[in-house]
């Protein structure tokens, strides 16, 4: 027949095409020609480079989106807290608000004790029971108002958290150790002093409380806003509660 004889041999009028690798009728691969091969490799390399750039751009867009999403969520939480604070359903200073529809308040000593006393669990959730100033945290502030509290009259005040211990028998009041560094100026000369102090952390008010080892019985408190672990309002007061100095501190670690 036209396609073959009885022995299976091809009786085609045309030879079978060769050169499946781009060599045409010669049967040679295109890569056998160094000039063609180099050109194609260079073209592939350029395409891969373009793809890598596109992937990098997409990664940057994704990172920016995630960062923006986190910032928006924190901003929303801050606004929510501000609105809550303006409404007339506050708990007194010795209680924590459960922030529920019933406006429930629970005692300060029940916050972060390992048992849920708020029906919504707000007193034991991660946000409430996280310590804003962990070990190694360092905060510094400038004192620009008249200091009627201290003997040293510092112009700069820094505290560094050196240890936090959460007692098993009373976890709602972690013990804190810190170092206080003060810079003072007198007669044009700067002096620095340091104090090792003990204190506690107050979950209800997000507050570090440090007690002076001196005989002046001063108490230093630094209160963190909700959703902000980088700034705190510093207050120096006498053991009787009278405030004699206020200033703002910022995280520097």
Swiss-Prot record:
CDD domains: hemoglobin_linker_C, LDLa. Pfam families: Eryth_link_C. Disulfide bonds join 91-105, 98-118, 112-129. Residues 89-131 form the LDL-receptor class A domain. Gene3D superfamilies: 2.40.128.620. GO terms for molecular function: oxygen carrier activity. It comes from the Eukaryota. Acts as a linker for the assembly of heme-containing chains in the construction of giant hemoglobin. Disulfide-linked dimer of identical chains. A model is proposed for the subunit structure of the Tylorrhynchus hemoglobin, consisting of 216 polypeptide chains, 192 heme-containing chains, and 24 linker chains. This is Giant extracellular hemoglobin linker 1 chain. It comes from Tylorrhynchus heterochetus (Japanese palolo worm).
């Amino acid at each position: 027949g036209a396609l073959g004889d009885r022995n299976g041999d091809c009786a085609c009028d045309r030879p079978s095409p060769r050169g499946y690798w781009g060599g045409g009728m010669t049967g040679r691969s295109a890569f056998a020609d160094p000039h063609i091969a180099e050109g194609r490799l260079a073209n592939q390399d350029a395409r891969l480079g373009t793809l890598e750039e596109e992937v990098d751009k997409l990664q940057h867009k994704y990172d920016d989106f995630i960062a923006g999403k986190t910032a928006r969520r924190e901003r929303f939480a801050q606004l929510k807290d501000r609105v809550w604070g303006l409404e007339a359903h506050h708990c007194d200073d010795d209680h924590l608000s459960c922030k529920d529809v019933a406006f429930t308040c629970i005692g300060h000593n029940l916050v972060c004790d390992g048992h849920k006393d708020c029906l919504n669990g707000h007193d034991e959730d991660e946000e409430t029971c996280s310590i804003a100033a962990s070990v190694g945290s360092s905060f510094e502030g400038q004192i620009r108002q008249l200091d009627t509290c201290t003997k040293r009259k510092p112009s700069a005040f820094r505290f560094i958290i050196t240890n936090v211990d959460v007692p098993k028998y009373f976890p709602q009041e972690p013990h804190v150790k810190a170092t206080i560094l003060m810079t003072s100026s007198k007669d044009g000369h700067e002096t620095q002093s340091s104090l090792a102090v003990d204190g506690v952390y107050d979950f209800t008010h997000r507050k570090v409380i440090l007690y002076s080892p001196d005989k002046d019985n001063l108490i230093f408190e630094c209160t963190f806003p909700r959703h902000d672990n980088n700034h705190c309002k510093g207050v120096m007061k006498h053991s009787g509660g009278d405030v004699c100095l206020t200033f703002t501190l910022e995280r520097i670690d």
